[in-house]
C-alpha cells in the first residue's frame, strides 16, 4: 500500500526516503524553561478571550514565554498551504485556498488588541497568485501601522521569484525590518529548498538594502552543512547587505522531513555568534532554540543603533570619532 501524508496525498519520493530514518532523540540542551510574567499572562488572556491565532501558540514555539513577556508575537498570513515545499518546513504544500482579502485587517486588529510593541508577519509562498501574494504582505504592514502607529513591524517574505515589482510593493509599505531567510548553504540548497535559488535569495536582501530597509536573514544548522560552508554563507549574506542574523538548530517536524544530520552544541552557536559580529552584522542571535523572530525588536534596535553610529562617524572629523558617544535611536518599544 502506498504511504500517504496526513493531508491525504501520496508521499513524495524524498518524503518516503526521509521517513526511512527514525525521528532523532533530542539532546539535553534542546529544552526551554517555563518562565511566565505579568506581560505574558496579559497577552495570553487577550489571545484567549478574543479567539486570536498566532504562530507562537499554533507552532508550539519554545520562545513564546519570552516573546509574549516582551509583547512580541508572530502571525502567519496567506493560508495554511504553501505552493512550495522545503524539506525542513512543517507547513503543508499544495494548492492553497483563495486569497482572504480581509486578513490584513484582522491581523492588524489582533496586533492592536494584544497591545504588541513589535509584530512579525510571515506567510506561505503564493505562486498561484499573479502578484505572488505581495499585496497581502504589503497591506498587512500598512494596516498594522495604521492601527498601531507605535508598533514595529517585521515582515518575513518569500522571494517572489526575485521580481522587482512584487518586492517593491512590499518595500514601499515600509516595514521596520525586511527579512528573507537564506536557511542553508549552496551545496545542499537545491535539495533542501528546491523552489528557491541561493543567489536569488541573496538578491532579495540586496534589493531590500538598496531600498533603505533594515535587512535580516536566518541560517539553519544541522542539515548537513560544514563549518567552512557556514562561514561562506555568512560572508555572502554580509556582502548582500544583510544587517541582522539568526542562527538556529534544525528540529525535524515529522519523519517525512529531512533527517537531523547533527546536533550543534551551544558552544558552537556562541562561536557563530562571534563570527557574525566579526563579519559586521549589526545584531546576531545564535542558539539551539533561537528562531528567526526571536527577540526581533531587540535585533531591530541594534540595527538602528549601528546605523546611527555610522551616520555619526560620517558627520564628524576622523580624529574626533573616538571621543564622541552616541545614544540609541529613540523607540517606543
Swiss-Prot record:
Binds 2 [4Fe-4S] clusters per subunit. One cluster is coordinated with 3 cysteines and an exchangeable S-adenosyl-L-methionine. GO terms for cellular component: cytoplasm. Residues 314-325 have a biased composition (Low complexity). It comes from the Bacteria. SMART domains: Elp3. PROSITE patterns: RADICAL_SAM (PS51918). The keyword Mitochondrion does not apply. Pathway: Protein modification; protein lipoylation via endogenous pathway; protein N(6)-(lipoyl)lysine from octanoyl-[acyl-carrier-protein]: step 2/2. [4Fe-4S] cluster 1 binds at residues 56, 61, 67, 293. Pfam families: LIAS_N (PF16881), Radical_SAM (PF04055). Keywords: 4Fe-4S, Cytoplasm, Iron, Iron-sulfur, Metal-binding, S-adenosyl-L-methionine, Transferase. Residues 68-282 form the Radical SAM core domain. Belongs to the radical SAM superfamily. Lipoyl synthase family. HAMAP family: Lipoyl_synth (MF_00206). This is Lipoyl synthase. The lineage of its organism: Bacteria, Bacillati, Actinomycetota, Actinomycetes, Frankiales.
